[in-house]
């Protein structure tokens, strides 16, 4: 099972639905749920930090990003939470995105396996990661956002600024499927 921490974003239920289409059990839980409570449930194999309007209302997710032993995928605000937790820089987007964005994958990796080097994704944010943390590598970028996706160099922690759960994102289901594989929920 994947738990989706609800940070109040408009697409949280789409994440749940997208996982259901992949036949992956998931559950939406409050973003205030303690990490110990999540990790004591042995059915939980991964965590998704959803998007949302306010990083200040997601402070518990900072602890989860830093201390979880489970794989994590941060989406939009969740991506920013991961960056902030590890010392990255969040700032106002140069161009507020509420539209399609062309994403460029730097090289194939666990998250972007079987995903083209260029694809169109749906973006919906005012803020973004403007400086990746030192212990993260940038996986993808766009012409208006230098850190569209990143990964911790040693832990299975990923962040994407765009929304793979939205149907407007090409290969979004494949990206979510790849995260599920990282969690050990799908075979190769």
UniProtKB/Swiss-Prot annotation:
It catalyses: XMP + L-glutamine + ATP + H2O = GMP + L-glutamate + AMP + diphosphate + 2 H(+). Pathway: Purine metabolism; GMP biosynthesis; GMP from XMP (L-Gln route): step 1/1. The keyword Transit peptide does not apply. The keyword ATP-binding applies. Keywords: ATP-binding, Glutamine amidotransferase, GMP biosynthesis, Ligase, Nucleotide-binding, Purine biosynthesis. Residues 1-188 form the Glutamine amidotransferase type-1 domain. SUPFAM superfamilies: Class I glutamine amidotransferase-like. The active site is at residues 76, 163, 165. InterPro entries: Class_I_gatase-like, GATASE, GMP_synth_GATase, GMP_synthase_A. It is an enzyme of class 6 (ligase). Its EC number is 6.3.5.2. Catalyzes the synthesis of GMP from XMP. Heterodimer composed of a glutamine amidotransferase subunit (A) and a GMP-binding subunit (B). This is GMP synthase [glutamine-hydrolyzing] subunit A. It comes from Methanococcus aeolicus (strain ATCC BAA-1280 / DSM 17508 / OCM 812 / Nankai-3). The lineage of its organism: Archaea, Methanobacteriati, Methanobacteriota, Methanomada group, Methanococci. The gene is guaAA.
């Amino acid at each position: 099972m994947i738990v989706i921490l609800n940070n109040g974003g408009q697409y949280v239920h789409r994440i749940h639905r997208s996982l259901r289409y992949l036949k992956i059990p998931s559950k939406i839980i409050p973003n205030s749920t303690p990490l110990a409570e999540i990790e004591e449930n042995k059915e939980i194999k991964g965590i998704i930090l959803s998007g949302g309007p306010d990083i200040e209302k997601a402070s518990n997710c900072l602890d989860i990003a830093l201390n979880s032993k489970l794989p994590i995928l941060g989406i939009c605000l969740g991506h920013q939470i991961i960056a902030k937790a590890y010392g990255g820089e969040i700032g106002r987007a140069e161009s507020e995105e509420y539209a399609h964005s062309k994403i460029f994958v730097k090289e194939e990796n666990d998250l972007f396996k079987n995903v083209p080097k260029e694809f169109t994704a749906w973006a919906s944010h005012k803020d973004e990661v403007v400086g990746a943390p030192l212990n993260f590598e940038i996986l993808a970028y766009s012409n208006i956002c230098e850190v569209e996706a990143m990964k911790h160099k040693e832990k299975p922690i990923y962040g994407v600024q765009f929304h793979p759960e939205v149907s407007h994102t090409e290969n979004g289901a494949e990206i979510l499927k790849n995260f599920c594989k990282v969690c050990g929920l799908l075979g190769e």
